[in-house]
Amino acid sequence: MSISKAIAADLLEIKAVSLSPSQPFTWASGIKSPIYTDNRVTLAYPEVRSQIEGAFAELIKAEFPEVEVIAGTATAGIPHGAIIADYLKLPFAYIRSKPKDHGAGNQVEGRVAKGQKMVVVEDLISTGGSVLEAVAAAEREGADVLGVVAIFTYELEKANSKFAESGVKLATLTNYSELIEIAKETGYVTKEELELLKKFKENQETWQA
């Protein structure tokens, strides 16, 4: 089994990802979805956590070999980013969703030199808006952002478009397509539910259970 499928299987097993095609979830954006993800759950499982961080380290070495600093997004990207930085023996920083309203007013916390090559760590890619804002904040501070890595992506067209428009490279450990394939192989979903899950990928904006 590929590492991508192995991680997808782990996410299902520990219920970091929940699938409910017949009784969909409502995201904060208002989108009705057959899937809900809380990757913070992975931190509670040492073996899963270790596999994720090791896979992240290998992914970063392969896709962004020039990296000089790892940055996590607040808050979900911080623990993963810190562990990855430790794996790679690199400096770590984190990026707030907005600047502090007191003190120095920092949005990027840590020591990041001008022109330092950075990889930003996020746990989940939904529409991509928040992590691309974090990238912009890091670039305003002088970082040279090589790209973004994440555990999982819903593969939403909106996110794909935003990353393409911004020119920011995205690499993920696993994705929606791999996850529903594993769900099919393991009998996690019925054939009817699988069809609903496939339709969600085809058009998330108009999907209905």
Swiss-Prot record:
Pathway(s): Pyrimidine metabolism; UMP biosynthesis via de novo pathway; UMP from orotate: step 1/2
Enzyme class: transferase
GO biological process: 'de novo' UMP biosynthetic process; pyrimidine nucleobase biosynthetic process
Keyword Ribosomal protein in annotation: no
Binding annotation for orotate: 126
CDD domains documented for this protein: PRTases_typeI (cd06223)
PROSITE patterns: PUR_PYR_PR_TRANSFER
Enzymatic reactions: orotidine 5'-phosphate + diphosphate = orotate + 5-phospho-alpha-D-ribose 1-diphosphate
Function field: Catalyzes the transfer of a ribosyl phosphate group from 5-phosphoribose 1-diphosphate to orotate, leading to the formation of orotidine monophosphate (OMP).
Quaternary structure and partners: Homodimer.
Family: Belongs to the purine/pyrimidine phosphoribosyltransferase family. PyrE subfamily.
NCBIfam families named among the record's database cross-references: pyrE
UniProt name for this protein: Orotate phosphoribosyltransferase
Primary gene name: pyrE
